[in-house]
């Protein structure tokens, strides 16, 4: 479902924190509706509760209105194990922090980040995910 078709879901939301979830590292980016751009932040190199504590610090620092999580799919759109892991991560964020969490198809974000010469592919992927989300807003 396109966010343009349901503008009430994002009404009043201005700032976002986005995540490119990985088993060992999670890319992070910040962005806003006004500029519709994203800025990479330091990648979180932690798992489990340590990852969530690091995210909590980022949320306190940036005070986003909502979160965005990239969800990986196979090129044909089929889900796989990492799809389910990222969706679980998304649910954990929603439950733990009480913020709206939007899921974005992140196919090819890492490939695009690497092709762009990103020094931190995870953070660059989070930027790509967030900018894709921001462009989809009405």
Swiss-Prot record:
Stated name of the protein: Putative pre-16S rRNA nuclease
Example of a GO cellular component annotation carried by this entry: cytosol
Keywords linked to the UniProt accession: Cytoplasm, Hydrolase, Nuclease, Ribosome biogenesis
E.C. number(s) listed in UniProt: 3.1.-.-
SUPFAM superfamilies: Ribonuclease H-like
Origin superkingdom: Bacteria
Function text: Could be a nuclease involved in processing of the 5'-end of pre-16S rRNA.
SMART domains (UniProt xref): YqgFc
Subcellular location: Cytoplasm
Organism: Polaromonas sp. (strain JS666 / ATCC BAA-500)
GO molecular function: nuclease activity
Protein's GO biological process: rRNA 5'-end processing
Family: Belongs to the YqgF nuclease family.
